[in-house]
A protein has these predicted regions:
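Beta-sandwich interaction modules
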Residues: 31-33, 77-118, 123-128
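N-terminal low-complexity, charged segments
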Residues: 21-28, 64, 81, 92
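Non-cytosolic beta-sandwich-type ligand-binding/adhesion modules
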Residues: 52-90
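A short beta-strand element within beta-rich, extracytoplasmic domains
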Residues: 38-48, 110-112
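Solvent-exposed, flexible loop/coil segments flanking beta-strands in beta-rich domains
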Residues: 1-35
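Extracellular Ig-like/FN3 beta-sandwich strand-entry sites
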Residues: 37, 52-54, 105
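C-terminal interaction-tip segments
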Residues: 1-13, 113-139
Length: 139
């Protein structure tokens, strides 16, 4: 390990869903090329969840940056956060390696769904182990 390398040269912001009060709907990051990173980590952040609200998040894959052939990535979703389950102000993480996409899939994005009631939430996707360093932030 090289202790002279900045952590920000090894881990970059690859995508984000800006923190906000979101109505019941689905929100996504842009498509992220896994040709850039060996791994990504999506961090989903729940703020104050509205009455009876739910928060779901998952990773999706596609064959290009426009979302062609979009599909869910197996086992790449959080356990649903709920207001009833006292999950306000909690975080959840989804990890993904480039070799987990399979087939001709080359891109990923994070999809976050707020259900039932307006809720505070946000997410960030970090790209790590860039194939060419130092990588730069996508956002």
């Amino acid at each position: 390990m090289n202790y002279n390398v900045l952590l920000s040269d090894q881990v970059q912001v690859a995508g984000a869903i800006d923190p906000d009060a979101y109505t019941a709907a689905t929100y996504t990051t842009g498509w992220i090329s896994m040709a850039t990173y060996n791994r990504i980590m999506a961090i989903v952040m729940a703020g104050t969840l509205g009455s009876s609200a739910t928060l779901d998040a998952k990773l999706e894959k596609a064959t290009d940056g426009s979302g062609t052939g979009a599909a869910d990535i197996t086992s790449k979703a959080i356990t649903q956060l709920t207001q009833a389950g006292t999950d306000s102000d909690k975080q959840a993480i989804i990890n993904c390696r480039s070799d987990e996409l399979g087939g001709a899939f080359t891109h990923v994005r994070l999809s976050m769904t707020v259900g039932t009631a307006t809720s505070d939430a946000g997410a960030i996707v970090l790209g790590a182990l860039a194939r060419f360093e130092p990588a730069t932030d996508a956002t």
